[in-house]
Protein backbone atom coordinates (compact mmCIF):
# COMPACT_ATOMS: atom_id res chain seq x y z
CA UNK A 1 0.00 0.00 0.00
CA UNK A 2 1.42 3.38 -1.05
CA UNK A 3 2.35 5.79 1.71
CA UNK A 4 0.92 9.30 1.67
CA UNK A 5 2.96 12.43 2.25
CA UNK A 6 0.12 14.26 4.01
CA UNK A 7 -0.41 11.42 6.50
CA UNK A 8 3.34 11.32 7.11
CA UNK A 9 3.39 15.02 7.99
CA UNK A 10 0.38 14.60 10.29
CA UNK A 11 2.07 11.76 12.17
CA UNK A 12 5.33 13.73 12.22
CA UNK A 13 3.53 16.63 13.90
CA UNK A 14 1.50 14.51 16.34
CA UNK A 15 4.08 11.93 17.40
CA UNK A 16 7.28 12.71 15.59
CA UNK A 17 9.59 12.66 18.65
CA UNK A 18 8.51 9.06 19.35
CA UNK A 19 8.77 7.97 15.71
CA UNK A 20 5.11 7.49 14.72
CA UNK A 21 5.78 8.63 11.15
CA UNK A 22 8.68 6.20 10.86
CA UNK A 23 6.47 3.33 11.99
CA UNK A 24 3.98 4.35 9.32
CA UNK A 25 6.71 4.32 6.67
CA UNK A 26 8.08 0.96 7.80
CA UNK A 27 11.31 2.45 9.15
CA UNK A 28 11.24 0.53 12.42
CA UNK A 29 14.91 1.09 13.31
CA UNK A 30 14.49 4.82 12.84
CA UNK A 31 11.32 4.76 14.95
CA UNK A 32 13.11 2.93 17.77
CA UNK A 33 16.00 5.39 17.60
CA UNK A 34 13.58 8.29 17.94
CA UNK A 35 11.79 6.61 20.87
CA UNK A 36 15.04 6.16 22.76
CA UNK A 37 16.35 9.67 22.06
CA UNK A 38 13.06 11.61 21.80
CA UNK A 39 13.63 12.51 18.22
CA UNK A 40 17.34 13.04 18.55
CA UNK A 41 16.83 15.57 21.32
CA UNK A 42 14.17 17.28 19.19
CA UNK A 43 16.74 18.53 16.68
CA UNK A 44 16.58 15.44 14.50
CA UNK A 45 12.80 15.55 14.52
CA UNK A 46 12.75 19.18 13.35
CA UNK A 47 15.43 18.57 10.74
CA UNK A 48 13.30 15.77 9.23
CA UNK A 49 10.64 18.26 8.13
CA UNK A 50 12.49 18.74 4.86
CA UNK A 51 13.42 15.05 4.53
CA UNK A 52 9.93 13.55 4.74
CA UNK A 53 9.24 13.63 0.96
CA UNK A 54 12.37 11.56 0.32
CA UNK A 55 11.41 9.15 3.12
CA UNK A 56 7.97 8.65 1.57
CA UNK A 57 9.45 8.13 -1.88
CA UNK A 58 11.90 5.62 -0.45
CA UNK A 59 9.12 3.72 1.32
CA UNK A 60 7.11 3.56 -1.91
CA UNK A 61 9.94 2.04 -3.93
CA UNK A 62 10.98 -0.67 -1.48
CA UNK A 63 10.74 -3.28 -4.21
CA UNK A 64 13.52 -1.57 -6.17
CA UNK A 65 16.01 -2.65 -3.50
CA UNK A 66 15.83 -6.15 -4.94
CA UNK A 67 17.50 -4.88 -8.10
CA UNK A 68 20.60 -3.57 -6.35
CA UNK A 69 23.70 -5.71 -6.93
CA UNK A 70 24.98 -7.31 -3.76
CA UNK A 71 28.40 -5.74 -4.23
CA UNK A 72 26.95 -2.20 -4.45
CA UNK A 73 27.61 -0.15 -1.32
CA UNK A 74 25.73 2.90 -0.09
CA UNK A 75 27.61 6.20 -0.33
CA UNK A 76 29.57 7.28 2.72
CA UNK A 77 27.56 9.59 4.96
CA UNK A 78 29.43 11.73 7.48
CA UNK A 79 26.12 12.50 9.20
CA UNK A 80 25.38 8.83 9.71
CA UNK A 81 28.95 8.21 10.90
CA UNK A 82 28.78 11.06 13.43
CA UNK A 83 25.34 9.88 14.58
CA UNK A 84 26.69 6.38 15.13
CA UNK A 85 29.43 7.73 17.39
CA UNK A 86 27.03 9.94 19.36
CA UNK A 87 24.36 7.25 19.82
CA UNK A 88 27.03 4.69 20.72
CA UNK A 89 28.30 7.02 23.45
CA UNK A 90 24.71 7.63 24.58
CA UNK A 91 23.98 3.91 24.87
CA UNK A 92 27.26 3.46 26.72
CA UNK A 93 26.38 6.17 29.24
CA UNK A 94 22.98 4.61 29.86
CA UNK A 95 24.65 1.24 30.40
CA UNK A 96 27.18 2.85 32.73
CA UNK A 97 24.37 4.26 34.86
CA UNK A 98 22.17 1.16 34.91
CA UNK A 99 24.47 -1.86 34.53
CA UNK A 100 27.88 -0.88 35.90
CA UNK A 101 27.37 -3.02 39.02
CA UNK A 102 27.27 -6.25 37.00
CA UNK A 103 30.33 -8.51 36.86
CA UNK A 104 32.64 -7.99 33.87
CA UNK A 105 30.68 -4.90 32.86
CA UNK A 106 33.60 -3.28 31.04
CA UNK A 107 34.27 -6.48 29.10
CA UNK A 108 30.70 -7.50 28.23
CA UNK A 109 28.03 -4.95 29.11
CA UNK A 110 29.70 -1.75 27.94
CA UNK A 111 30.91 -2.88 24.49
CA UNK A 112 27.61 -4.65 23.87
CA UNK A 113 25.60 -1.52 24.67
CA UNK A 114 27.83 0.76 22.59
CA UNK A 115 27.88 -1.67 19.67
CA UNK A 116 24.10 -1.99 19.66
CA UNK A 117 23.75 1.79 19.62
CA UNK A 118 26.06 2.02 16.61
CA UNK A 119 24.20 -0.79 14.83
CA UNK A 120 20.84 0.88 15.47
CA UNK A 121 21.95 3.99 13.58
CA UNK A 122 23.56 1.84 10.88
CA UNK A 123 20.18 0.15 10.30
CA UNK A 124 18.26 3.40 9.78
CA UNK A 125 16.53 3.62 6.41
CA UNK A 126 17.45 1.17 3.66
CA UNK A 127 20.96 0.52 4.95
CA UNK A 128 22.49 -1.81 7.49
CA UNK A 129 25.90 -3.16 8.48
CA UNK A 130 27.60 -6.34 9.55
CA UNK A 131 26.44 -7.34 13.03
CA UNK A 132 29.37 -9.59 13.97
CA UNK A 133 32.16 -7.32 12.75
CA UNK A 134 30.70 -4.22 14.40
CA UNK A 135 30.22 -5.91 17.77
CA UNK A 136 33.60 -7.60 17.36
CA UNK A 137 35.31 -4.23 17.00
CA UNK A 138 33.57 -3.00 20.15
CA UNK A 139 34.57 -6.07 22.18
CA UNK A 140 38.18 -5.95 20.95
CA UNK A 141 38.53 -2.28 21.89
CA UNK A 142 37.04 -2.52 25.38
CA UNK A 143 39.97 -4.35 27.11
CA UNK A 144 42.38 -1.59 26.07
CA UNK A 145 40.52 0.89 28.29
CA UNK A 146 39.30 -1.59 30.89
CA UNK A 147 37.67 -0.02 33.94
CA UNK A 148 37.65 3.52 32.57
CA UNK A 149 34.39 5.31 31.72
CA UNK A 150 36.29 7.14 28.95
CA UNK A 151 36.34 3.77 27.15
CA UNK A 152 32.88 4.61 25.80
CA UNK A 153 34.32 7.01 23.21
CA UNK A 154 37.03 4.82 21.63
CA UNK A 155 34.69 1.81 21.64
CA UNK A 156 32.03 3.83 19.84
CA UNK A 157 34.59 5.21 17.39
CA UNK A 158 35.98 1.76 16.56
CA UNK A 159 32.50 0.27 16.15
CA UNK A 160 31.37 3.18 13.96
CA UNK A 161 34.39 2.88 11.67
CA UNK A 162 33.77 -0.85 11.32
CA UNK A 163 30.06 -0.32 10.66
CA UNK A 164 30.87 2.18 7.92
CA UNK A 165 33.42 -0.16 6.39
CA UNK A 166 30.84 -2.96 6.16
CA UNK A 167 27.83 -0.80 5.23
CA UNK A 168 25.42 -2.27 2.71
CA UNK A 169 21.85 -2.06 1.54
CA UNK A 170 19.26 -4.14 3.33
CA UNK A 171 18.13 -7.30 1.62
CA UNK A 172 14.49 -7.38 0.60
CA UNK A 173 12.23 -9.04 3.13
CA UNK A 174 8.63 -10.12 3.17
CA UNK A 175 6.05 -7.76 4.59
CA UNK A 176 5.19 -8.15 8.27
CA UNK A 177 2.03 -7.27 10.11
CA UNK A 178 1.98 -4.13 12.21
CA UNK A 179 1.45 -6.13 15.40
CA UNK A 180 4.62 -8.15 14.81
CA UNK A 181 6.63 -5.01 14.11
CA UNK A 182 5.28 -3.24 17.19
CA UNK A 183 6.02 -6.30 19.32
CA UNK A 184 9.63 -6.35 18.17
CA UNK A 185 10.11 -2.60 18.64
CA UNK A 186 8.44 -2.78 22.05
CA UNK A 187 10.76 -5.53 23.24
CA UNK A 188 13.79 -3.53 22.13
CA UNK A 189 12.44 -0.44 23.90
CA UNK A 190 11.90 -2.36 27.14
CA UNK A 191 15.37 -3.90 26.90
CA UNK A 192 16.80 -0.37 26.84
CA UNK A 193 14.60 1.36 29.41
CA UNK A 194 14.03 -1.54 31.82
CA UNK A 195 17.52 -1.69 33.36
CA UNK A 196 17.67 2.10 33.52
CA UNK A 197 14.33 2.37 35.33
CA UNK A 198 15.30 -0.45 37.71
CA UNK A 199 18.61 1.19 38.56
CA UNK A 200 17.01 4.59 39.05
CA UNK A 201 14.26 3.38 41.39
CA UNK A 202 16.16 0.77 43.40
CA UNK A 203 19.39 2.69 43.74
CA UNK A 204 17.66 5.92 44.61
CA UNK A 205 20.30 7.25 46.98
CA UNK A 206 23.14 6.81 44.50
CA UNK A 207 21.04 8.29 41.71
CA UNK A 208 20.12 11.28 43.87
CA UNK A 209 23.74 11.90 44.81
CA UNK A 210 24.85 11.69 41.19
CA UNK A 211 22.07 14.00 39.98
CA UNK A 212 22.71 16.42 42.84
CA UNK A 213 26.42 16.62 42.07
CA UNK A 214 25.69 17.15 38.39
CA UNK A 215 23.14 19.86 39.11
CA UNK A 216 25.50 21.50 41.58
CA UNK A 217 28.27 21.71 39.00
CA UNK A 218 25.82 22.91 36.37
CA UNK A 219 24.30 25.65 38.53
CA UNK A 220 27.72 26.86 39.65
CA UNK A 221 28.36 28.01 36.08
CA UNK A 222 25.70 30.69 36.54
CA UNK A 223 27.23 32.28 39.64
CA UNK A 224 28.04 35.46 37.73
CA UNK A 225 24.64 35.58 36.02
CA UNK A 226 22.06 35.48 38.83
CA UNK A 227 19.04 36.19 36.63
CA UNK A 228 19.92 33.37 34.25
CA UNK A 229 20.72 31.14 37.22
CA UNK A 230 17.30 31.74 38.74
CA UNK A 231 15.68 30.93 35.41
CA UNK A 232 17.57 27.63 35.21
CA UNK A 233 16.63 26.79 38.79
CA UNK A 234 12.97 27.47 38.01
CA UNK A 235 13.11 25.14 35.02
CA UNK A 236 14.78 22.40 37.07
CA UNK A 237 12.24 22.71 39.87
CA UNK A 238 9.21 22.96 37.59
CA UNK A 239 8.42 19.19 37.57
CA UNK A 240 8.41 19.10 41.38
CA UNK A 241 6.15 22.13 41.60
CA UNK A 242 3.73 20.63 39.08
CA UNK A 243 3.67 17.46 41.18
CA UNK A 244 2.90 19.50 44.28
CA UNK A 245 -0.01 21.18 42.50
CA UNK A 246 -1.39 17.78 41.53
CA UNK A 247 -1.08 16.19 44.98
CA UNK A 248 -2.06 19.30 46.91
CA UNK A 249 1.20 20.11 48.67
CA UNK A 250 4.92 19.40 49.00
CA UNK A 251 4.48 15.92 50.40
CA UNK A 252 5.55 12.59 48.97
CA UNK A 253 4.14 9.43 50.45
CA UNK A 254 6.72 6.93 49.22
CA UNK A 255 10.14 6.83 50.84
CA UNK A 256 11.74 6.86 47.41
CA UNK A 257 9.81 9.97 46.43
CA UNK A 258 11.00 11.55 49.67
CA UNK A 259 14.53 11.17 48.34
CA UNK A 260 13.53 13.17 45.27
CA UNK A 261 12.01 15.77 47.58
CA UNK A 262 15.45 16.10 49.15
CA UNK A 263 16.81 16.78 45.68
CA UNK A 264 14.25 19.56 45.31
CA UNK A 265 15.41 21.06 48.60
CA UNK A 266 19.02 20.73 47.45
CA UNK A 267 18.41 22.71 44.27
CA UNK A 268 16.21 25.21 46.09
CA UNK A 269 18.96 25.77 48.66
CA UNK A 270 21.18 27.31 46.00
CA UNK A 271 19.21 30.53 46.41
CA UNK A 272 20.12 30.69 50.12
CA UNK A 273 23.77 29.97 49.38
CA UNK A 274 23.87 32.72 46.77
CA UNK A 275 22.35 35.19 49.22
CA UNK A 276 24.91 34.32 51.90
CA UNK A 277 27.76 34.63 49.42
CA UNK A 278 26.40 37.95 48.15
CA UNK A 279 26.31 39.35 51.70
CA UNK A 280 29.92 38.26 52.21
CA UNK A 281 31.08 39.85 48.94
CA UNK A 282 29.45 43.20 49.72
CA UNK A 283 30.39 43.01 53.39
CA UNK A 284 26.89 43.67 54.70
CA UNK A 285 25.00 41.68 57.35
CA UNK A 286 21.90 39.65 56.61
CA UNK A 287 18.85 41.84 56.85
CA UNK A 288 20.73 44.91 55.60
CA UNK A 289 18.57 47.63 54.10
CA UNK A 290 18.66 48.53 50.43
CA UNK A 291 20.46 51.77 51.29
CA UNK A 292 23.23 49.88 53.12
CA UNK A 293 23.58 47.44 50.25
CA UNK A 294 23.72 50.24 47.68
CA UNK A 295 26.24 52.22 49.73
CA UNK A 296 28.54 49.23 50.14
CA UNK A 297 28.20 48.45 46.44
CA UNK A 298 29.23 51.98 45.42
CA UNK A 299 32.22 51.96 47.76
CA UNK A 300 33.47 48.58 46.54
CA UNK A 301 32.98 49.49 42.89
CA UNK A 302 35.16 52.56 43.38
CA UNK A 303 37.86 50.45 45.01
CA UNK A 304 37.87 47.56 42.53
CA UNK A 305 37.01 49.24 39.25
CA UNK A 306 39.54 47.98 36.65
CA UNK A 307 40.29 51.54 35.54
CA UNK A 308 41.50 52.33 39.07
CA UNK A 309 43.66 49.19 39.35
CA UNK A 310 45.73 49.01 36.20
CA UNK A 311 48.59 47.38 38.11
CA UNK A 312 46.39 44.36 38.99
CA UNK A 313 43.83 44.29 36.20
CA UNK A 314 42.89 40.61 36.37
CA UNK A 315 42.27 40.58 40.12
CA UNK A 316 40.35 43.84 39.94
CA UNK A 317 38.18 42.56 37.12
CA UNK A 318 37.41 39.38 39.05
CA UNK A 319 36.40 41.33 42.17
CA UNK A 320 34.42 43.79 40.07
CA UNK A 321 32.36 41.00 38.48
CA UNK A 322 31.76 39.38 41.88
CA UNK A 323 30.54 42.71 43.27
CA UNK A 324 28.21 43.25 40.31
CA UNK A 325 26.75 39.75 40.64
CA UNK A 326 26.33 40.07 44.42
CA UNK A 327 24.57 43.41 44.07
CA UNK A 328 22.23 41.98 41.44
CA UNK A 329 21.30 39.14 43.80
CA UNK A 330 20.64 41.37 46.81
CA UNK A 331 18.81 44.08 44.88
CA UNK A 332 16.11 41.67 43.73
CA UNK A 333 12.79 41.68 45.63
CA UNK A 334 12.78 39.07 48.37
CA UNK A 335 10.39 36.18 47.74
CA UNK A 336 8.78 34.23 50.58
CA UNK A 337 10.09 30.67 50.68
CA UNK A 338 7.82 27.66 50.47
CA UNK A 339 7.23 25.97 53.77
Swiss-Prot record:
CDD domains: DnaJ. Residues 4-50 form the TM2 domain. Residues 277-339 form the J domain. One of its GO terms (cellular component) is membrane. The chain crosses the membrane at residues 5-25, 30-50, 81-101, 105-125, 135-155, 185-205, 218-238. May function as a co-chaperone. It comes from Mus musculus (Mouse). Keywords: Chaperone, Membrane, Transmembrane, Transmembrane helix. Its main location: membrane. InterPro entries: DnaJ_domain, J_dom_sf, TM2. It comes from the Eukaryota. The lineage of its organism: Eukaryota, Metazoa, Chordata, Craniata, Vertebrata. It is found in: Membrane. It is a multi-pass membrane protein. This is DnaJ homolog subfamily C member 22. Pfam families: DnaJ (PF00226), TM2 (PF05154).
Amino acid sequence: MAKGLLMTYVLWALGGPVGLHHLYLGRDSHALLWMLTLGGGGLGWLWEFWKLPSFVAQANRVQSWKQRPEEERPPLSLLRFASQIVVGVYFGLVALVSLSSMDNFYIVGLPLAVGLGVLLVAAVGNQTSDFKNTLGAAFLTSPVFYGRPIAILPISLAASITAQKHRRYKASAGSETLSVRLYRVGLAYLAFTGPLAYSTMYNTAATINYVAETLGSFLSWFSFFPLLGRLVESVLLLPCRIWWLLVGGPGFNSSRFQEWEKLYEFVDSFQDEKLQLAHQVLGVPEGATNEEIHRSYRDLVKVWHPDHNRHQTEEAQRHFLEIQAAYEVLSQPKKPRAS
